[in-house]
């Protein structure tokens, strides 16, 4: 059994591709089942017993515990075909952007991701919650077995250790904070701007918190469910509107921050063109934090619109990285120690079937000799003589296999067994 992590992220693929292979949160369980089924197809030489999928705005990754007779390259191909088939994309479009990490590299990657070392925002905490959600869904879908369950439990423990014993998350600039900084390049005073947030999830809540600190002129939450939008808007003394109201009200807002789970764009080119015309070409600042994107990319070409995606925010969120290099080194050292510990556990698991076979074989021998002793006792034989025969019979049966193997071996094989048997039976020789 081998562990494998296959996927793409913000360092290997642009948002235009990442959004095509993103899995909606409510489809992760179904996707895990599909992945396991795909790996087990008769035309595939790889079979996965366990699988989990992590899908965020910055990455889509499949973790698997599989038999891999074809090696890593075959695993990449099979996973790429699965992703392409599931999302109805050309295989050739995905293959160059994928990475595949086997065994200890897969474990190390999972530990680094959960600890925030592989994030666009170094040390950001949201990824840990996202990974926990992915694992819960994989478990509910039957995707977790002995290996992935143990790996993810250790992953969460490592992430907790890294975050509690290092400064990896200190002074990091989040996407939400970067959005505020960028908007201040367009508008001198946020306090004079009307801000619209589309969605009501964690990212929007974080963004609204950062913008609220700048005392904007107004705050509005647009959400598919009005009640949920109202709950969030109340926290920021704002109002809530329905997504259906956006075409008529978009022109009222100077700053638009969007992050929903929609699989299709919510704001189209025509809607923004009409809004800009109604605003008499007053600039509009827009940040699309969603993957797949909520705002059509073509909108960024409009003269009076400043549109940024998660990839565009990358340079802003690197602030303070240099100051955290010592924390990174500490975190990497912790991770390396924990990877070695986990791989030792993996190696130990490999001999479990051998140990089980030994127990079963010994139990069979024991039952044979015990039954023979019971029959002798039933005939009235002397108990000491029966016990003596029982002990000798067990000894003979236990040693028969090793003795026969040693007698039948020749040359180097006999020398190897002769050196090994004293270690196994802890004799003096």
UniProtKB/Swiss-Prot annotation:
| Glycoprotein recorded as keyword | no
Binding positions for substrate per the UniProt entry: 56-59, 119, 124-126, 130
Query: Which PROSITE patterns does the record associate with it?
Result: GLUTR
Pathway annotation from the record: Porphyrin-containing compound metabolism; protoporphyrin-IX biosynthesis; 5-aminolevulinate from L-glutamyl-tRNA(Glu): step 1/2
Pfam families of this UniProt entry? GlutR_dimer, GlutR_N, Shikimate_DH
EC assignment: the record states: 1.2.1.70
CDD domains documented for this protein:
NAD_bind_Glutamyl_tRNA_reduct
Catalytic activity entry:
(S)-4-amino-5-oxopentanoate + tRNA(Glu) + NADP(+) = L-glutamyl-tRNA(Glu) + NADPH + H(+)
Q: Record's InterPro entries?
A: 4pyrrol_synth_GluRdtase (IPR000343), 4pyrrol_synth_GluRdtase_dimer (IPR015896), 4pyrrol_synth_GluRdtase_N (IPR015895), GluRdtase_CS (IPR018214), GluRdtase_dimer_dom_sf (IPR036453), GluRdtase_N_sf (IPR036343), NAD(P)-bd_dom_sf (IPR036291), Shikm_DH/Glu-tRNA_Rdtase (IPR006151)
Q: What class of enzyme is it?
A: oxidoreductase
Gene Ontology molecular function: glutamyl-tRNA reductase activity; NADP binding
List UniProt keywords, sorted A-Z.
NADP, Oxidoreductase, Porphyrin biosynthesis
Give site residues, Important for activity: 109
- The UniProt entry annotates the active site at 57 (nucleophile)
GO BP of this protein: protoporphyrinogen IX biosynthetic process from glutamate
Any remaining note in the record?
A: During catalysis, the active site Cys acts as a nucleophile attacking the alpha-carbonyl group of tRNA-bound glutamate with the formation of a thioester intermediate between enzyme and glutamate, and the concomitant release of tRNA(Glu). The thioester intermediate is finally reduced by direct hydride transfer from NADPH, to form the product GSA.
Quaternary structure and partners: Homodimer.
The family note in this entry says: Belongs to the glutamyl-tRNA reductase family.
Provide the function of this protein.
Catalyzes the NADPH-dependent reduction of glutamyl-tRNA(Glu) to glutamate 1-semialdehyde (GSA).
In the record's own words, the domains note is: Possesses an unusual extended V-shaped dimeric structure with each monomer consisting of three distinct domains arranged along a curved 'spinal' alpha-helix. The N-terminal catalytic domain specifically recognizes the glutamate moiety of the substrate. The second domain is the NADPH-binding domain, and the third C-terminal domain is responsible for dimerization.
Q: What's the protein called, per UniProt?
A: Glutamyl-tRNA reductase
